[in-house]
């Protein structure tokens, strides 16, 4: 047991560990979100003061981003599928792969500890000084959160190096870069973004650590520092990070739509690759659109507004290519396809509110209101999460060799779809009416939509529990699939379900008939 799970060098076992860890962290993060909506479901205090509320909000963000979405998408799906899709026997650095995973549980432990000592880190996930300085947040909480981020960051950097090396060196003969599956492309682009952005975050939080403990003043004006420098460094990481969260989802959705539509390949395959490359590149030159309210020159604001809007172009290319892939087919309303439909529609809605927020003059008004919360939850809670659900259902027979009950899955999709939309759509109205983020209480005029939002979160919770029940049911009944339902979009299906522990003992050769 310990050889298989603690010291594993097998990409499938490590991928499974990532899935289990991500699911567990996801349940913690979901519980925190339920606490947030319970607090906001009625006026007046419920859980406590704003410090504990902001600790919950901060932990919710960190856990969902660093311990749920990234481990599942990059660690889980990436580890499982990239070697299988490349025809590689394993990852390039199998032991480093294991270390990448085992840095996450200590990291999560540090983060949870940070909320249990002193007053907790109630800084928001951005950890801006001076709120995160040694004066406003005395005690060890923020320091523990910083160490947690360092560990998670090292884990991601090592994983990124591993994926990049694997994709460069371990492709089977015949898999040229232009014929590499879109999911593999999405993971390698994500890995490059991680490699370039995380060191900047590490620098920023290390400077914050020394400001708090070693009497430096990088971000303290009293010592000649500049609090704004932190924001620039943080968002230079923070904006690529949001593309890191969604790009593997793009790759998965491309595979699912192509395969379920019965098409030979995705519409505009090469264009899809260039679109992802463009999104990755542009993601690095738009960071200050998170900072329109800090007082930038009008020409700077004009540049960041324009550059941000340009990102909508490659994103639009991807949306329309997905629609073109579905075009002309007899649509199958299979569970995975339903999630993919939901992804395309809701991600588009989230993208449109993003284009609204890109306008610096409008953003001055909407900054730090619930409009922003609604925007990024549409692209995360209904983009990244829907992609994870679609991918998990689609590749579940490959991962486990079992099938889930498709009718139950459709019901579960309907519950989740209603739940998340009921939760986040009203938040657009709250934001337009001026309700600010990160406050535990609000004027009574905002009550009605907050009640609707909290009701939606309860429905989402039951949908998640139902999904766990569906997985449990499939595992105790042990229904095995006879064969994959459609022509496969990639070579990972040319194995037993589930694949043998070691695949591609003899390297495959891909011919033009592929």
Swiss-Prot record:
Gene assigned in the entry: COI
Bilayer topology: Multi-pass membrane protein
Binding site for Mg(2+): 367-368
Name by which UniProt lists this protein: Cytochrome c oxidase subunit 1
An annotated GO cellular component: respiratory chain complex IV
Binding-site positions, O2: 243
Binding, Fe(II)-heme a: 60, 377
Described function: Component of the cytochrome c oxidase, the last enzyme in the mitochondrial electron transport chain which drives oxidative phosphorylation. The respiratory chain contains 3 multisubunit complexes succinate dehydrogenase (complex II, CII), ubiquinol-cytochrome c oxidoreductase (cytochrome b-c1 complex, complex III, CIII) and cytochrome c oxidase (complex IV, CIV), that cooperate to transfer electrons derived from NADH and succinate to molecular oxygen, creating an electrochemical gradient over the inner membrane that drives transmembrane transport and the ATP synthase.
Localization annotation: Mitochondrion inner membrane
Residues reported to bind Cu cation: 239, 289-290
UniProt xrefs under PROSITE patterns: COX1 (PS50855), COX1_CUB (PS00077)
Entry-linked Pfam families: COX1
Cofactor, how bound (note): Binds 2 heme A groups non-covalently per subunit.
Cofactor(s) demanded: heme; Cu cation
Key word Heme present: yes
InterPro entries according to UniProt: Cyt_c_oxase-like_su1_dom, Cyt_c_oxase-like_su1_sf, Cyt_C_Oxase_1, Cyt_c_Oxase_su1_BS, Cyt_c_oxase_su1_dom
Cross-link (1'-histidyl-3'-tyrosine (His-Tyr)): 239-243
Family under the similarity heading: Belongs to the heme-copper respiratory oxidase family.
């Amino acid at each position: 047991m310990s050889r298989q799970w603690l010291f594993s060098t097998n990409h499938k076992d490590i991928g499974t560990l990532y899935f289990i860890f991500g699911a567990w962290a996801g349940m913690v993060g979901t519980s925190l979100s339920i606490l947030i909506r319970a607090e906001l479901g009625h006026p007046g205090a419920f859980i406590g003061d704003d410090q504990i509320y902001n600790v919950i909000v901060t932990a919710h963000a960190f856990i969902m981003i660093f311990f749920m979405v990234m481990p599942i998408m990059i660690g889980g799906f990436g580890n499982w599928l990239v070697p299988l899709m490349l025809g590689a026997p394993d990852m390039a650095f199998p032991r480093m792969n294991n270390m990448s995973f085992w840095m996450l549980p200590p990291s999560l432990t540090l983060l949870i500890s940070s909320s249990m000592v002193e007053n907790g880190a109630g800084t928001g996930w951005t950890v801006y000084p001076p709120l995160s300085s040694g004066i406003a947040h005395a005690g060890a909480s923020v320091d523990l959160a910083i160490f947690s981020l360092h560990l998670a960051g090292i884990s991601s950097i090592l994983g990124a190096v591993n994926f990049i090396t694997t994709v460069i060196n371990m492709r089977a003969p015949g898999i040229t870069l232009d014929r590499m599956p879109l999911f593999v492309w999405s993971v390698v682009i994500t890995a490059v973004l991680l490699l370039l952005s995380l060191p900047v975050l590490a620098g920023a939080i290390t400077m914050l650590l020394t400001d708090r403990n070693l009497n430096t003043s990088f971000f303290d004006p009293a010592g000649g520092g500049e609090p704004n420098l932190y924001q620039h460094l943080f968002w230079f990481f923070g904006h690529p990070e949001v593309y890191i969260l969604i790009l593997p989802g793009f790759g998965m959705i491309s595979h699912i739509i192509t395969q379920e539509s019965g098409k030979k390949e995705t519409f505009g395959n090469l264009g899809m690759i260039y679109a992802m490359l463009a999104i990755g590149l542009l993601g690095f030159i738009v960071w200050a659109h998170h900072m329109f309210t800090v007082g930038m020159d009008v020409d700077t604001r004009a540049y960041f507004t324009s550059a941000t809007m340009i990102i909508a172009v490659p994103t639009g290319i991807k949306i329309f290519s997905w629609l073109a892939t579905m075009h002309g087919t007899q649509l199958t309303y299979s569970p995975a396809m339903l999630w993919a439909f939901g992804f395309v529609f809701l991600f588009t809605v989230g993208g449109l509110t993003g284009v609204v927020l890109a306008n610096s003059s409008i953003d001055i008004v909407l900054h730090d209101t619930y409009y922003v919360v609604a925007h990024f939850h549409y692209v995360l809670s209904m983009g990244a999460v829907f992609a994870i659900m679609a991918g998990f259902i689609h590749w579940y027979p490959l991962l486990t060799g079992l099938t889930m009950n498709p009718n139950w899955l459709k019901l579960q999709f309907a519950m989740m779809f209603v739940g998340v939309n009921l939760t986040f759509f009203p938040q657009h109205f709250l934001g337009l009416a001026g309700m600010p983020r990160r406050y535990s209480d609000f004027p009574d005029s905002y009550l009605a939509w907050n009640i609707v939002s909290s009701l939606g979160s309860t429905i989402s919770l039951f949908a998640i529990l139902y999904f766990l029940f569906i997985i449990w049911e499939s595992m105790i009944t042990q229904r095995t699939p006879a064969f994959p339902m459609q022509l496969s979009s990639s070579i990972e299906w040319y194995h037993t379900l589930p694949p043998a522990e070691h695949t591609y003992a003899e390297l495959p050769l891909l011919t033009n008939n592929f």
